[in-house]
UniProtKB/Swiss-Prot annotation:
Record-annotated disulphide pairs: none
SUPFAM superfamilies: Ribosomal protein L6 (SSF56053)
Protein name: Large ribosomal subunit protein uL6
Subunit text: Part of the 50S ribosomal subunit.
GO MF entries: rRNA binding; structural constituent of ribosome
Source species of the chain: Paraburkholderia xenovorans (strain LB400)
Keywords: Ribonucleoprotein, Ribosomal protein, RNA-binding, rRNA-binding
Functional note: This protein binds to the 23S rRNA, and is important in its secondary structure. It is located near the subunit interface in the base of the L7/L12 stalk, and near the tRNA binding site of the peptidyltransferase center.
Family per similarity comment: Belongs to the universal ribosomal protein uL6 family.
Biological process terms in GO annotation: cytoplasmic translation
Gene this protein is translated from: rplF
Gene Ontology cellular component terms for the protein in this record: cytosolic large ribosomal subunit
HAMAP family attached to this UniProt entry: Ribosomal_uL6_B
Length: 176
């Protein structure tokens, strides 16, 4: 059995609804749903969820760990939420959150407007910082990657959009 799949998931005040096709987790921040896999049996045991493979196949063992990780992220999302921080490095690079849109000034001849998907919020504590928040870990990471993709950090000066904890290794310029 998968090492990850063996450890149970504590619900931490979230409610879980189990059916044959879906697992739905409801918490103070919202509700999130995930398709259930037929190779994994999910058991609700007094505030903890246990994931057991239906048979001893490699695929069922692997899927038990995958389902456990996905549901653990769902529980964390509806109780605490996820966030990803981005910083803008460069002269004139600015960000401004307006409702469900993120306006970026990244040195192009036009402003870049990124539409936030439903359930994801963007905040700009300063003009050069962006905080992307939501209950779905995958969606938060995807939106952060899309925003970074508009102007990834370049290797000579390090200008661009980068994750807050990202280290950009700078190249040396060509010498005569």
């Amino acid at each position: 059995m998968s090492r990850v799949g063996k450890s149970p998931v504590a619900l931490q005040g979230a409610e879980v609804a189990l059916s044959d096709e879906r697992i739905t987790v409801k918490g103070p921040l919202g509700t999130i749903s995930q398709a259930a896999n037929s190779l994994v049996k999910v058991v609700n045991d007094n505030g903890t969820l246990k994931f057991e493979p239906v048979d001893e196949s490699r695929e069922a063992n692997a899927m038990s760990g995958t389902m456990r990780a996905l549901v653990a992220n769902m529980v964390n999302g509806v109780t605490k939420g996820f966030e990803r921080k981005l910083t803008l490095v460069g002269v004139g690079y600015r960000a401004q959150a307006q409702g469900d849109k993120l306006n970026l000034s990244l040195g192009f001849s036009h402003p870049v407007v990124h539409q936030m998907p439903e359930g994801i919020k963007a905040e700009t504590p300063t003009q050069t910082e962006i905080v992307i928040k939501g209950i779905n870990k995958q969606q938060v990471g995807q939106v952060a990657a899309e925003v970074r993709g508009y102007r990834p950090p370049e290797p000579y000066k390090g200008k661009g959009v980068r994750y807050a904890n990202e280290v950009v290794i700078l190249k040396e310029t060509k010498k005569k």
